[in-house]
Amino acid sequence: MRFGIVVFPGSNCDIDCYYVLKDELQQEVEYIWHEEELKEGFDCIILPGGFSYGDYLRCGAVAQFSKVMEGVKVYAHAGGLVVGICNGFQILTEAGLLPGALVRNKGLKFICDTTPLKVTEANSPFTNQYQKGEVIQIPIAHGEGNYVVDEVTLAEMKTKGQILFTYGENPNGSTGDIAGICNEGKNVMGLMPHPERASEALLGNVDGKKFFQSIMHYLEGGKNND
């Protein structure tokens, strides 16, 4: 299978994602520059963490208008798998591909730590190798990770199984302790924590590896974990 990793000016987690997919999981991976058109043939597109366009205006606000995002939107609306990690999550909300928004952390400080996450929905292309209710440890590094959404949309997301990960110890004030969500079609997913930073035994934590293995399992035709 073939993964595409979008690189914006200011991206800094693209290499980590590439390394995990290429060297740890032996997948075909290609970088996609923000000024390029999105080519055909990708099985999954990843928007990595970082500070796209310097986070000017607000996180993800400029990146959503990049040339490559035109293709990403078409790809997503056609059912293609799209993942946004940290800044990538912010971009997906700004682009309207995911509900809600990411704003300043409640404590108004940048947080860099490892935090417990609860897998709240295992029936998705991104979590099918986890067990529902499983608690994992994943690094976070963000200043604007406070997820906000209106009560009506939140209720709909809960009903439709769109909340995939919640914080065990809410570090940023996110509504409903939300750490990761997907769209109604379950093909577009965003999360603030960094699974790519917990996918190699050398780092002492492989809890994030099953995130990428879930995508691979789904693309190979495997069933989601009910």
UniProtKB/Swiss-Prot annotation:
Pathway the protein contributes to: Purine metabolism; IMP biosynthesis via de novo pathway; 5-amino-1-(5-phospho-D-ribosyl)imidazole from N(2)-formyl-N(1)-(5-phospho-D-ribosyl)glycinamide: step 1/2
SUPFAM superfamilies: Class I glutamine amidotransferase-like
Cysteine disulfide partners in this protein: none
One matching Pfam family: GATase_5
GO MF: ATP binding; glutaminase activity; phosphoribosylformylglycinamidine synthase activity
Active site: residue positions: 86 (nucleophile), 194, 196
Subunit structure: Part of the FGAM synthase complex composed of 1 PurL, 1 PurQ and 2 PurS subunits.
Function as written in the Swiss-Prot or TrEMBL entry: Part of the phosphoribosylformylglycinamidine synthase complex involved in the purines biosynthetic pathway. Catalyzes the ATP-dependent conversion of formylglycinamide ribonucleotide (FGAR) and glutamine to yield formylglycinamidine ribonucleotide (FGAM) and glutamate. The FGAM synthase complex is composed of three subunits. PurQ produces an ammonia molecule by converting glutamine to glutamate. PurL transfers the ammonia molecule to FGAR to form FGAM in an ATP-dependent manner.
HAMAP family registered for this protein in UniProt: PurQ
Protein name: Phosphoribosylformylglycinamidine synthase subunit PurQ
Organism in which the protein naturally occurs: Alkaliphilus metalliredigens (strain QYMF)
